[in-house]
Amino acid sequence: MNQPSGNKLPHVTTRRMLDMKERGEKIAMLTAYDYTMARILDRSGVDAILVGDSASNVFAGHSTTLPMTVDEMIYHAKAVVRGVQAETRRAMVIVDMPFMSYQLSPEDAVRNAGKIMKEHECDAVKMEGGKVIAEAVKRITDIGIPVMGHLGLMPQSIYKYGSYKVRAMEEEEARQLIEDAKIIEEAGAFAIVLEKIPSKLAGEVSRLLTIPTIGIGAGPECDGQVLVINDMLGLSTDFRPRFVRRYADLSSVIEQAVKSYVEDVRSNSFPSEDESY
């Protein structure tokens, strides 16, 4: 993305995220999957927008994130990037690499990361996993593509876990998570998402790493926070985990608006003369 001109705030980069951690400034990230929402988020001041494979759940209605493909992620990413470019161009845009787009081999990972970056002007990709994907992370960053890691609860591994419960509650798994975080940082990641792990552990990881940690259900000691936009706006009425704070109840607002529209159409009070040509 190009740098904004005039009085607009500078575009958030990997360097700026590192600076924010060093200064103790919290990083605010939200998901978006379309042009309109991306415009709203960018002008509202978020630091980063994640084009999440959670689109599989909230956009397409699947029960897991696994069905998303590289081409589907690119479709959503293009829309989000256009939305950001239409506004302040401030927010960093990060795109999830979907299931099986990087797990087969480092070569496959590089190829798919390159495709995602080449087909639109996003800023980085995100990958789930620790030591097992370290070589892929290194290879991708070596060719100039920034990578955000993801540890703790990893939705692409849901069938391995068997549930969405809190991860790293036991000492052995907590030690492994710390080790994986160090490995992913050493492989070149510029930040790591920590999902649904104990707050104390997230704080420990955040202090150990020089790169920012972005928490989702990981407590207040992370360097930043991320939520799925549909959850925090109250659009996902059948899903409300403990870590989600709802800032609006848009489901009810939309439902009432649609009911009013239907009533106006059926009563022939819409459109009026002022709304006609």
UniProtKB/Swiss-Prot annotation:
Pfam families in the record: Pantoate_transf (PF02548)
Alphabetized UniProt keyword annotations: Cytoplasm, Magnesium, Metal-binding, Pantothenate biosynthesis, Transferase
Active site: 195 (proton acceptor)
CDD domains: KPHMT-like
Residues that, per the record, bind 3-methyl-2-oxobutanoate: 53-54, 96, 126
Extent of the signal sequence: none
Keyword Magnesium part of the UniProt annotation: yes
Annotated compartments: Cytoplasm
Catalysed reaction equations from the record: 3-methyl-2-oxobutanoate + (6R)-5,10-methylene-5,6,7,8-tetrahydrofolate + H2O = 2-dehydropantoate + (6S)-5,6,7,8-tetrahydrofolate
Family note: Belongs to the PanB family.
Protein name per the record: 3-methyl-2-oxobutanoate hydroxymethyltransferase
Organism field: Chlorobaculum tepidum (strain ATCC 49652 / DSM 12025 / NBRC 103806 / TLS) (Chlorobium tepidum)
Taxonomic lineage: Bacteria, Pseudomonadati, Chlorobiota, Chlorobiia, Chlorobiales
Gene that encodes the chain: panB
